Amino acid sequence: MVKKISYIFFSILVFLDKVLKILTKRSFLIWFKDFIQEKSYKSINILDKEIKFFVPNQLLEWRVKTCLTKEPETLQWIDSFEKKENLIFWDIGANIGLYSIYNSLKNINSTTIAFEPSSSNLRILTRNISINNLEKNIKVVPIPLTNKE
């Protein structure tokens, strides 16, 4: 029964997609995905630049909203880095990229290496880097760092 209902629902979506492609030249499924995800993005001002973050849940939305006030000592530490071209910043446990993105904006000529082993965080991290066009500044390494073999 569930298979039949799923198939009927899928068939209706495919039909709507075809009709709307003819009428509007745009896929209904892509439009619907964009519509649903539109509220999943939050913008904040970091160093006089509007930076977007993908925040698919309330916890991540809170993290983005409080990133400039929650751990001011971390931001002060990044601010204290000597300005030089060969600066390499390791963000160990990069999560969704708050500090990786902050460093790449603050220290424009630096290279940021974001270590993040969690696949769900990795998906969000790479999206946040991409939507802010920081792929050249931030390299993602999808493994954990440890002192154990």
Predicted segments, located by residue:
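Conserved residues in the N-terminal Rossmann fold of short-chain dehydrogenase/reductase
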Residues: 140-143
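Short loop/turn elements that flank and shape the SAM/SAH-binding pocket of Class I
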Residues: 146-149
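S-adenosyl-L-methionine
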Residues: 1-128, 132-133, 137
